[in-house]
Amino acid sequence: MKPAYAILLGLFAAFPALGASDVKNGQKLAETHCARCHVIGDFNKFGGIGSTPSFGLLIGMADGFERFRTFFERRPHPAFVSVPGVPRWTDLPPYAKPFEVTPENIDDLISFVRKLD
């Protein structure tokens, strides 16, 4: 794990205690950005990319919520997801529309995903 990501993960771990997350914002983030590759549920149950795990499958994994918390550093996400203060892993242009997430966005997304569980 790159040092900047280790520091960022520590910051993310601290954020849930700071305040309530926004489930509706998490849902909006998932539907806007994640649904282009992942099946989220009834929202796009016939969508996604065939080789990409659905949110339901990810939730069922032993480390599923950790995968959501660290998705921005897991392939292929670093190519198009940016985090403030963390340099991208590559200078190559993103192959999907890039977007930025914050620790609050991650908490919102996880709150939404917990509602799906």
Q: Where is each model-derived feature located?
A:
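A common structural junction motif
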Residues: 73-80
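Electrostatic cytochrome c docking/interface patches
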Residues: 13-29
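Gly/Gly-Pro-rich "capping" loops immediately C-terminal to redox-active cysteine motifs
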Residues: 42-73
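Sec-dependent signal peptide recognition
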Residues: 2-9
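Inter-heme linker and motif-flanking segments adjacent to c-type heme-binding CXXCH motifs
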Residues: 41-44, 115-117
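The canonical Cys-X-X-Cys-His
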Residues: 31-41, 109
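C-terminal capping alpha-helices of c-type cytochrome domains
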Residues: 86-117
